[in-house]
Amino acid sequence: MAIRYVRKIGDEVLRKKAKPVTEINSHILTILEDMAQTMYLNDGVGLAANQIGVLRRLVVIDVGEGLLELINPEIVYEEGEQVGAEGCLSIPGVVGEVKRPKKVKVKYLDREGKEREIEGEDLLARALCHEIDHLNGVLFIDKAIRFLDEEEKEQVKYFGNMSRGW
């Protein structure tokens, strides 16, 4: 396992669409492990493979309920609406309000290659959408309704809504 460099805004890899994983092998599993370690070291909520320069459809997420590893994730259902603050490990210091579905269902493969589904609401739904957007070359700043100023960012941190980055 290794800590990977998190690519920052301006790096063209963040704007590229990731390719599906066709074979789950030791290389893919190592990337997932590196992604999780990198996410935790950076105090993140999620990380997409694009963010470490790997153009494969891989995502790791932990909203405080344990690590999720998703291979080839795809949103198959969404409902409702929520607006909330988002940041990104690839765009340090920027926080914006983004409209997302309140609830999503995502189909994906686990590390054994079994097809799974996960339903997420609130923060998990937001994180799933945010990371899957990354896989499609879309950043939260593309969808932000508005950006928070420094005082607002401090208030959001104080109330615990942004205690961890994306």
Curated annotation (Swiss-Prot):
Q: Which GO terms describe its molecular function?
A: metal ion binding; peptide deformylase activity
On cofactor binding, the record's note says: Binds 1 Fe(2+) ion.
| Binding of Fe cation, residues | 88, 130, 134
Q: Name one Pfam family in it.
A: Pep_deformylase
Q: Name one GO biological process term.
A: translation
Q: Name the EC number(s).
A: 3.5.1.88
Q: Which named protein is this?
A: Peptide deformylase
Q: Which cofactor does it need?
A: Fe(2+)
User: Its domain of life?
Assistant: Bacteria
The organism that produces this protein has a lineage beginning with: Bacteria, Bacillati, Bacillota, Clostridia, Thermoanaerobacterales
Is the Ligase keyword given for this protein?
no
Q: What does this protein do?
A: Removes the formyl group from the N-terminal Met of newly synthesized proteins. Requires at least a dipeptide for an efficient rate of reaction. N-terminal L-methionine is a prerequisite for activity but the enzyme has broad specificity at other positions.
What is the similarity comment for this entry?
Belongs to the polypeptide deformylase family.
| Catalysed reaction, written as an equation | N-terminal N-formyl-L-methionyl-[peptide] + H2O = N-terminal L-methionyl-[peptide] + formate
Q: Does the keyword Aminoacyl-tRNA synthetase apply?
A: no
Q: InterPro entries in the record, alphabetically? A: Peptide_deformylase, Peptide_deformylase_sf
Q: Which keywords does the record carry?
A: Hydrolase, Iron, Metal-binding, Protein biosynthesis
Active-site residue list: 131
Q: Tell me which NCBIfam families the record gives.
A: pept_deformyl, PRK00150.1-3
- Give the originating organism: Thermoanaerobacter sp. (strain X514)
Checking PANTHER family in the record gives: PEPTIDE DEFORMYLASE
